[in-house]
Amino acid sequence: MAFELPKLPYAFDALEPHFDKETMEIHHDRHHNTYVTKLNAAVEGTDLESKSIEEIVANLDSVPANIQTAVRNNGGGHLNHSLFWELLSPNSEEKGTVVEKIKEQWGSLEEFKKEFADKAAARFGSGWAWLVVNNGQLEIVTTPNQDNPLTEGKTPILGLDVWEHAYYLKYQNKRPDYIGAFWNVVNWEKVDELYNATK
């Protein structure tokens, strides 16, 4: 197998009560696992098997046309979720260089959270909300489906899955409540690590 489902860096119930155990189990073991299985099927026998998922997603135009859609959807799904799990933590602490940079750009962490939440809530249908580094500056963007900002040359350092499968069992159609809960489990240490790696 070229690509594998990563283990969660915490227990399924570690993010309770914000992200519930049942959703985490289904999201990781079924949804993410399906992306990995379909991605492996799509790239089997191609030179993509030896490339990193980041390299593939950043260079989607070079993926053969007959498998490009499958790789975009499932490769994006694998990359996005692999990053998402690492960006969550039961020990969320708002500190680091990136937090200072956010305050510098948005005026306050609360203003940043408001803009991020507004854009995440406004993302029509399925997709993701991201904090990215673009030419040295922070920027909030959203992507449809399983698209990743790397495809546009932007480096994601924080991401939130706003597909219904990420929150429907607990929050039903109340996406803003799910987005609000997200701030309680952000792994700012990982966000800071990703931000500093772009310098």
Swiss-Prot record:
One of its GO terms (molecular function) is superoxide dismutase activity. It catalyses: 2 superoxide + 2 H(+) = H2O2 + O2. Gene3D superfamilies: Fe,Mn superoxide dismutase (SOD) domain, Iron/manganese superoxide dismutase, C-terminal domain. Its cofactor is Mn(2+). Binds 1 Mn(2+) ion per subunit. Mn(2+) binds at H27, H81, D161, H165. PROSITE patterns: SOD_MN (PS00088). SUPFAM superfamilies: Fe,Mn superoxide dismutase (SOD), C-terminal domain, Fe,Mn superoxide dismutase (SOD), N-terminal domain. Its EC number is 1.15.1.1. Induction: Transcriptionally induced by internally generated superoxide stress in a manganese-dependent way. The presence of manganese increases SodA homodimer activity and simultaneously decreases SodM homodimer activity. This occurs primarily due to post-transcriptional effects, since the expression of the gene is independent of manganese availability in the absence of superoxide generating compounds. One of its GO terms (cellular component) is cytoplasm. InterPro entries: Mn/Fe_SOD, Mn/Fe_SOD_BS, Mn/Fe_SOD_C, Mn/Fe_SOD_N, Mn/Fe_SOD_N_sf, SOD_C_sf. Coiled coil: none annotated. Disulfide bonds: none annotated. Pfam families: Sod_Fe_C (PF02777), Sod_Fe_N (PF00081). The keyword Transcription regulation does not apply. GO terms for biological process: removal of superoxide radicals. It is an enzyme of class 1 (oxidoreductase). Keywords: Manganese, Metal-binding, Oxidoreductase, Stress response. Belongs to the iron/manganese superoxide dismutase family. Homodimer. Can also form a heterodimer with SodM. Destroys superoxide anion radicals which are normally produced within the cells and which are toxic to biological systems. May play a role in maintaining cell viability throughout all stages of growth, but may be the major SOD activity in the exponential growth-phase. Has a role in resisting external superoxide stress. Involved in acid tolerance and the acid-adaptive response. Mediates the derepression of perR regulon in the response to HOCl stress when the level of SOD activity is low. According to PubMed:10383955 the levels of SodA activity and sodA expression are growth-phase dependent, occurring most during post-exponential phase. This response was also dependent on the level of aeration, with highest activity and expression occurring under high aeration. Transcribed from two sigma-A-type promoters (PA1 and PA2). Transcriptional data show an indirect repression of PA1 promoter by sigma-B. This is Superoxide dismutase [Mn] 1. It comes from Staphylococcus aureus (strain NCTC 8325 / PS 47).
